[in-house]
């Protein structure tokens, strides 16, 4: 099944995977706690605004994963002290779904939300997942690994994720049976102490 790009979010582990039929010549590059999805050196030139973006941003209050330019404002709002729910909801609402031929949803999550955040009822780290589609804006707390994708699985749904460290998470979601994997990123930890890894199918 082809579900497009997707995030998996839980209190201490998260992932983002690029799956693409149209633009497979992309890679995930890690720089100082940020993972950027960008064209490979041999990729054809394109003016598509949805090809390159930060897919992971680590902050002191949680690690943000997502499928587009909304990752940056979510991370910035977290750093400003917004509750995790609001930090996701406001950028998703303002940026809305992608204005492409498919009305592609935006998906996002925050891993390792501080237990003091009013968004979470967790005793330890919490997690929040969200999506904005043409017909809905959904943001909710999650306590177990949960997936939301751009197509087919476009509402938060339970996901069987066994890995617990960042590199294994990145590899596990890349190798998942969903079709047309391009690259992936994994994050593990809690606020202030995150490990980040990428996998490009080498």
Swiss-Prot record:
Domain of life according to the entry: Archaea
Transmembrane segments: none
Stored Pfam families: IMP_cyclohyd (PF07826)
EC number, as in UniProt: 3.5.4.10
UniProt region (Disordered), positions on chain: 29-52
Database matches in NCBIfam families: PRK04151.1 (NF003167), purO_arch (TIGR01922)
Protein name, UniProt field: IMP cyclohydrolase
Organism from which the protein derives: Haloarcula marismortui (strain ATCC 43049 / DSM 3752 / JCM 8966 / VKM B-1809) (Halobacterium marismortui)
Gene name tied to this protein: purO
């Amino acid at each position: 099944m082809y579900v497009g790009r997707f995030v998996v979010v839980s209190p201490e582990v998260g992932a983002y995977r690029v799956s693409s039929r149209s633009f497979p010549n992309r890679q995930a590059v890690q720089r100082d706690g940020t993972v950027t999805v960008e064209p490979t050196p041999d990729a054809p030139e394109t003016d598509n605004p949805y090809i390159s973006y930060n897919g992971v941003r680590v902050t002191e209050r949680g690690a943000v994963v997502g499928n587009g330019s909304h990752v940056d404002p979510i991370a910035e709002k977290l750093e400003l002290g917004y509750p995790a729910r609001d930090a996701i909801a406001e950028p998703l609402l303002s940026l809305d779904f992608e204005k492409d031929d498919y009305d592609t949803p935006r998906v996002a999550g925050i891993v390792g939300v501080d237990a003091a955040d009013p968004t979470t009822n967790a005793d330890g780290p919490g997690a929040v997942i969200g999506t904005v589609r043409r017909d809905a804006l959904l943001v909710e707390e999650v306590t177990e690994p949960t997936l939301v994708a751009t197509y087919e699985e476009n509402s938060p749904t339970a996901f069987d994720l066994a890995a617990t460290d960042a590199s294994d998470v990145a590899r596990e979601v890349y190798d998942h049976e969903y079709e047309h994997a391009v690259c992936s990123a994994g994050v593990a930890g809690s606020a202030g102490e995150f490990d980040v890894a990428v996998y490009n199918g080498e």
